[in-house]
Amino acid sequence: MKNEIHPDYHPVVFQDAGTGFQFLTRSTATSDRTIAWEDGNEYPLIVVDVTSESHPFWTGAQRVMDTAGRVEKFERRFGGMARRKKKA
């Protein structure tokens, strides 16, 4: 293996923004925020939108994730095209 070409792989805490669920894993991701973990050490904290605690596949619950109104925006821009009939 070559030296100095691999990214820094270190322990990181990920936190679910919706549920507050946290887990410690290893990652190349970095953050200025830190958190004291159960073992007494400080680790970088990365807040994410979805984890296994809140993802519909794992929870069995459906949740709308359309934060930007993308479907409505698409309908406004292109919705009329499907309704128009082509003239022969």
Swiss-Prot record:
Database matches in InterPro entries: Ribosomal_bL28/bL31-like_sf, Ribosomal_bL31, Ribosomal_bL31_B, Ribosomal_bL31_sf
Family according to the record: Belongs to the bacterial ribosomal protein bL31 family. Type B subfamily.
GO CC annotations on file: ribonucleoprotein complex; ribosome
Gene Ontology molecular-function annotations: structural constituent of ribosome
Keywords, comma-separated and alphabetical: Ribonucleoprotein, Ribosomal protein
Protein name: Large ribosomal subunit protein bL31B
Assembly mode: Part of the 50S ribosomal subunit.
Record bears the keyword Ribonucleoprotein: yes
Ribosomal protein in keyword set: yes
GO biological process, one term: translation
Organism placement in taxonomy: Bacteria, Bacillati, Actinomycetota, Actinomycetes, Mycobacteriales
Transmembrane segment boundaries: none
SUPFAM superfamilies in the cross-refs: L28p-like (SSF143800)
